[in-house]
């Protein structure tokens, strides 16, 4: 337990330090050790300070990856997008575009829920493939798109099934009579 206190004390020392190089090296160290929460906390402070320096690209990419590795996919996608918009020809642009799409893919809900984020994920992955058609990650991106499209098809099926089930529901006589007169809306959903 002594190592834990030393570690916490060391982390607090890093947070309180005014030496940005020291903080950046500590953030890289935490990132390398898989301590993404600590890395992201430090990098959040540093990205504006490091803007315009040689460490700016790497710090923004590491911040995005820190959130990605913590499972905060929306924040990760935001920072990946910020990276590739700021550095369109940057060192990590291909990875940032790919991981932005993958982060949105991982954040999509189950088919019965609203699928707005699924459309965003498809769009982001298609943009990745447009910008990097020869990427070694192209096949993975295509598989994610197919998976997302399957999710949308399942959503449409569930919606159509719901309309069909409502149309054949016999508990409400006036509703059922109205459906017989006006027709079942099921076919309009297909």
Q: Model-found features: residue ranges?
A:
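Acidic, polar-rich low-complexity tracts and alpha-helical solenoid repeat scaffolds
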Residues: 4-190
């Amino acid at each position: 337990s002594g190592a834990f206190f030393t570690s916490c004390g060391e982390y607090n020392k890093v947070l309180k330090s005014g030496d940005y190089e020291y903080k950046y090296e500590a953030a890289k160290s935490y990132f390398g050790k898989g301590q993404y929460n600590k890395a992201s906390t430090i990098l959040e402070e540093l990205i504006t300070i490091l803007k315009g320096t040689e460490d700016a690209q790497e710090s923004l990419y590491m911040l995005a990856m820190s959130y990605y590795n913590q499972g905060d996919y929306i924040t990760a996608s935001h920072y990946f997008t910020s990276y590739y918009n700021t550095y369109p020809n940057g060192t990590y642009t291909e990875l940032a575009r790919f991981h932005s799409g993958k982060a949105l893919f991982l954040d999509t809900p189950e088919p019965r829920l609203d699928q707005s984020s699924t459309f965003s994920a498809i769009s982001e992955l298609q943009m990745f493939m447009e910008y990097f058609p020869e990427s070694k990650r192209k096949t993975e991106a295509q598989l994610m798109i197919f998976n997302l499209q399957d999710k949308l098809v399942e959503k449409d099926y569930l919606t159509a099934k719901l309309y069909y089930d409502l149309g054949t529901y016999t508990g409400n006589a006036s509703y059922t009579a109205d459906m017989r007169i006006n027709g079942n809306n099921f076919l309009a959903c297909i």
